[in-house]
Regions:
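Extended, low-complexity cationic-aromatic segments
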Residues: 1-61, 162, 166
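RNase H-like polynucleotidyl transferase catalytic core
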Residues: 5-15, 94-114
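Short glycine-/polar-rich loops that comprise or flank the Walker A/P-loop
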Residues: 19-21, 72, 98-101
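Short beta-strand segments
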Residues: 26, 74-80, 103-106, 159
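Short, basic/hydrophobic alpha-helical segments
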Residues: 56-75
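RNase H-like two-metal-ion nuclease catalytic core shared by retroviral integrases
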Residues: 79-80, 87, 103-125, 135-137
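Short, aromatic/basic amphipathic alpha-helical patches
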Residues: 86-96
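C-terminal anion-handling pockets and recognition modules
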Residues: 115-168
């Protein structure tokens, strides 16, 4: 923007600017099978009583959905997000130890987390969006995540980028 000398330009925008889009995801690998990615998206508009983001129940539901669709046990490698360490989440993990094993990544190691690569792909796409409202951002995020789900080569790239998984 520009303005006259000595006058600060003011850009008027629509909306309150008090919304956000939160994402949670699982990047899945099984030797001999194609890589998979599961996700959950939540929109927060600032309404009374509305959750501000993804909660432990959303993560629980995402894990259960992945377990059902994958049809087998899950070894989960997680970062140290506070929600991952919450007491109800730890209880859920303990109650489902027959199909769920969890390892924590070291602190401050996003380079070891393949899901960070997925988020980078989404943000690179959505970052260039001039959205009119929060709903448009949410739709763009969901659309990009759906595209990534159908591109196992992108998921593979995020997995091999961590060097935690190698082919052969």
């Amino acid at each position: 923007s520009w303005g006259r000398k000595g006058c600060t330009p003011v850009v008027r925008v629509r909306g309150r600017g008090s919304g956000r889009v939160s994402m949670a995801g699982l990047t899945c690998y099984k030797p001999g099978n194609r890589s998979r990615m599961f996700y959950s998206v939540r929109e927060y508009r600032g309404r009374k009583g509305e959750p501000k983001g993804i909660g432990w129940r959303d993560l629980r539901d995402l894990l259960v959905r992945a377990h059902i669709q994958l049809g087998g046990p899950i070894v989960l490698v997680w970062d140290n997000l506070r929600m991952h360490l919450a007491e109800p989440m730890r209880e859920f993990i303990a109650d489902h130890a027959d199909w769920l094993t969890v390892f924590q990544l070291p602190s401050y190691s996003p380079d070891l987390n393949p899901q960070e690569g997925i988020w980078s792909l989404v943000k690179r796409d959505v970052g260039n969006l001039a959205a009119a409202d929060l709903g448009q951002i949410t739709r763009a995020v969901r659309r990009r995540l759906k595209q990534i789900q159908y591109r196992p080569d992108l998921v593979d790239g995020c997995l091999t980028g961590t060097r935690l998984i190698t082919d052969g």
